């Protein structure tokens, strides 16, 4: 019986063609696939890739429309929004051009570097762009990355997270956006090339070079180090848009030092207003400043578009609290509404919250934690606050008093009282 089974001719498990009818038959666990079926699968995947790209490029809005939607979510940063809108539009138009087969002019990919203080909106800009374009999006923290072979996270894990965001649709993932935060933290330790191995600084920059420029990376679907025997997914990064962001603390002094060197006499020593440093000095940013900060020239070369974000002032922070579609105060008000309670935040309280965030130097990022702290006790006993109004005043923000709780007098209750009074009047 065993001899007869061995003599039985092998067939493709998908098209049922016999071994002698095809060029190659590849064995798997209890299954076989022929070269013709493999080619058919490749054709299907290529067609799906074209359809996925067509869906993205056919619906891509103009730079003005992109900027308009960004305005709904991001306060201020007009120059950064304009630069991003144009860069993203050109990126996806480039994909459409490449897919069309035109090769008369080669269009290079333009990754983006965002430089701005903590809480200025770098991450929110990248997230909102991905939402507008409806493409897979993932974020990575550069501080957790290390060179391959060292303790920490491999660069390929960023691509794995993008694949997960695309539900392992390779064609879709290849048109996605990756945002790498805290990229200033992987600056090399000195301006000169390192003699000792810098595995979390220059080493990470070197590891990022290839995937940012465009390569076919082998991505481990279950993570690289825990499952070394797994099959790899091939992901082409040529059309993935990389946006890097960082605060680059201290780069203003590098710029000032460079620009002051060209000054004459005592003019070079004039104290520069801090506000001017944040808004004007960064506008003089040059590639040599980034190199001096610790980014290697090759890494800077992969980020041809550089834009800066301003420090947010008190007025901008108050606007962030109330105006955007996803404004923090709107979110908390909705949460209270869900429990049939009402939240009121007075204008003076909004200003006090903004001042607190400025004092802590946390920018917009710190606003939510301040409000969370103010409302913690109220949210803890929210079940008892049904038909109650919680009011946050300036004194509440300053910690002088607790949030003020009062009863809500509904219009229906007033109406019923009036009706009762009318009924009591004798005819």
Swiss-Prot record:
Function: ATP-dependent specificity component of the Clp protease. It directs the protease to specific substrates. Can perform chaperone functions in the absence of ClpP.
SMART domains xrefs: AAA, ClpB_D2-small, zf-C4_ClpX
Stored Pfam families: AAA_2, ClpB_D2-small, zf-C4_ClpX
Database matches in Gene3D superfamilies: 1.10.8.60, ClpX chaperone, C4-type zinc finger domain, P-loop containing nucleotide triphosphate hydrolases
Family according to the record: Belongs to the ClpX chaperone family.
Domain of life per record: Bacteria
Record GO cellular component, one term: HslUV protease complex
Residues given in the record as Zn(2+) binding sites: 12, 15, 34, 37
GO BP annotations listed: cell division; proteolysis involved in protein catabolic process
GO function terms (MF aspect): ATP binding; ATP hydrolysis activity; ATP-dependent protein folding chaperone; protein dimerization activity; unfolded protein binding; zinc ion binding
Subunit structure, as described in the record: Component of the ClpX-ClpP complex. Forms a hexameric ring that, in the presence of ATP, binds to fourteen ClpP subunits assembled into a disk-like structure with a central cavity, resembling the structure of eukaryotic proteasomes.
InterPro entries listed in its UniProt record: AAA+_ATPase, ATP-dep_Clp_protease_ClpX, ATPase_AAA_core, Clp_ATPase_C, Clp_protease_ATP-bd_su_ClpX, ClpX_bact, P-loop_NTPase, Znf_CppX_C4
Keywords: ATP-binding, Chaperone, Metal-binding, Nucleotide-binding, Zinc
Organism: Rickettsia bellii (strain OSU 85-389)
UniProt name for this protein: ATP-dependent Clp protease ATP-binding subunit ClpX
Limits of the ClpX-type ZB domain: 1-53
List of residues binding ATP: 117-124
UniProt xrefs under PROSITE patterns: CLPX_ZB
Record gene name: clpX
